[in-house]
Curated annotation (Swiss-Prot):
GO cellular component: a single term: plasma membrane
UniProt KW keywords: Antiport, Cell membrane, Membrane, Transmembrane, Transmembrane helix, Transport
One Pfam family per UniProt: Multi_Drug_Res
Source organism: Pseudomonas aeruginosa (strain ATCC 15692 / DSM 22644 / CIP 104116 / JCM 14847 / LMG 12228 / 1C / PRS 101 / PAO1)
Protein family (similarity comment): Belongs to the drug/metabolite transporter (DMT) superfamily. Small multidrug resistance (SMR) (TC 2.A.7.1) family.
Keyword Transport: yes
Biological processes per GO annotation: choline transport; glycine betaine transport; transmembrane transport
Cell location: Cell membrane
Protein name per UniProt: Multidrug transporter PA4990
Protein task: Confers resistance to ethidium bromide, acriflavine and methyl viologen.
Gene Ontology molecular function terms on file: amino-acid betaine transmembrane transporter activity; antiporter activity; choline transmembrane transporter activity
Bilayer topology annotation: Multi-pass membrane protein
Amino acid sequence: MTNYLYLAIAIAAEVVATTSLKAVAGFSKPLPLLLVVGGYVLAFSMLVLVMRTLPVGVVYAIWSGLGIVLVSLVAMFVYGQRLDPAALLGIGLIIAGVLVIQLFSRASGH
């Protein structure tokens, strides 16, 4: 269970870092830059811990898939990005893929 907590922290940190990239404004704003650097350092640090016991393919699929979904949603609410039907379908397919991996994959740790 601890590994999934670390994975959740990694995903959240990556989402904060990625969505803060837009606010950096050409490196002219230091606080968003700190969020970017700190977020990525935290995200990858947590991924290192998670990958000690969980399969790399499963971890990366969950991390990247949920990261894409959450970054898209944050961009929609914070930056006013519009998601067209194709984007919403894609997000739905990503969520479905993560669920399939979580519920039905027999991948084991190394």
